[in-house]
Regions:
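Flexible hinge/capping segments at coil-to-helix
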Residues: 126-143
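Periplasmic-binding protein-like
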Residues: 42, 118-126, 151-155, 194, 198-255, ...
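Short helix-initiation/N-cap motifs at beta->coil->alpha
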Residues: 76-87, 169-184, 216-218
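A ligand-binding cleft/hinge motif common to bilobed small-molecule-binding domains
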Residues: 84, 101-109, 154-159, 180-184, ...
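Short beta-strand-centered segments that line the small-molecule binding cleft or hinge
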Residues: 86-100, 108-121, 211
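Extracytoplasmic small-molecule ligand-binding "clamshell" domains
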Residues: 22-100, 245
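Ligand-binding cleft/hinge of the Venus flytrap
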Residues: 64-73, 151-171, 201-205
């Protein structure tokens, strides 16, 4: 009987130890260190970018700052290489990736993604006089994307057959450089986010460029480490709270002229 009791005690301690090892302390970790570090591509307006004073600003930045304030911690925006964002997150140098990031099956495999907070479309931008008004018209054309972007994933995955009809797919580190290349005739189209593309073109005063052909709908979400479910859930809870009290509407209206967020109200 004593031997049986000892065996059961060992098993109970092992199970208890395993449970403790798997306990999610991600929210407590943020509160203890006193900072909430957001990883972003700082050339992705209006979600996150550098203003004329070199300060990092944007819609996502304003929302994340409010989340950090409600957590009672300091907000830090940490620029990262978008092509290595998953490595930056896994290494622990940032707490989340929050920068107009599309929700994809691949990203849901490697990260704990939030619910969508903003709807978007992936659009081919062309020169206004190019006469490209359909996907078929892109055959034989050169198309630019940002390295590590959802656009790149689409053309190498679900839309690989379409990409095979292009003369080439060009990779750029920043969309601004890609749009300037398009303007100068270096490529025939740029596949990018509608929200970002329209903002960039308006800011450039590029009346010679236009949103020509839509490829697919898209949703933005926030990515956390797979084990940080509690932190992901807490941020979702705060976003819902901000939707209810009108804070999200206020921030969205400042950047987009109206509330285009899709955060659930409960």
């Amino acid at each position: 009987m004593k031997k049986l009791f000892a065996t059961l005690l060992v098993l109970m301690l092992e199970v208890s130890g395993l449970a403790m090892a798997e306990e999610d302390t991600s929210v407590e970790n943020i509160l203890e260190k006193g900072t909430f570090i957001l990883g972003l591509d700082d050339s992705f307006p209006p979600m996150g970018f550098r203003d004329e004073n070199n300060d990092i600003v944007g819609f996502d930045i304003d929302v994340a700052k409010e989340v950090a304030a409600r957590l009672g911690v300091e907000f830090i925006a940490q620029p990262i290489s978008w092509d290595a964002k998953e490595l930056e997150l896994a290494s622990g140098t940032i707490d989340c990736i929050w920068n107009g990031m599309s929700i994809t099956p691949e990203r849901e495999e490697s990260m704990a993604m939030t619910f969508p907070y903003l709807n978007n479309q992936m659009i081919f931008y062309t020169r206004a006089d190019a006469g490209i008004d359909s996907l078929e018209a892109l055959a034989g054309k050169s198309v630019a994307v940002q390295n590590g972007s959802y656009a790149e994933e689409l053309l190498s995955g679900d839309y690989a057959d379409l990409a095979a009809t292009f003369s080439e797919v060009l990779g750029f580190d920043e969309y601004l450089t890609a749009l300037m290349d398009l303007q100068n005739g270096g490529c025939d189209a740029v596949l990018m986010d509608l929200v970002v593309g329209d903002y960039r073109i308006n800011g450039m005063g590029a009346t010679d460029l236009k949103a020509a052909v839509a490829l697919t709908d898209d949703n933005y979400g926030i990515g956390f480490r797979k084990e940080d479910i509690a932190l992901r859930d807490k941020v979702e809870e705060l976003l819902i709270e901000m939707k209810k009290d009108g804070t999200l509407e206020k921030i969205s209206t400042q950047w987009f002229g109206s509330d285009i967020t899709v955060v659930p109200a409960e």
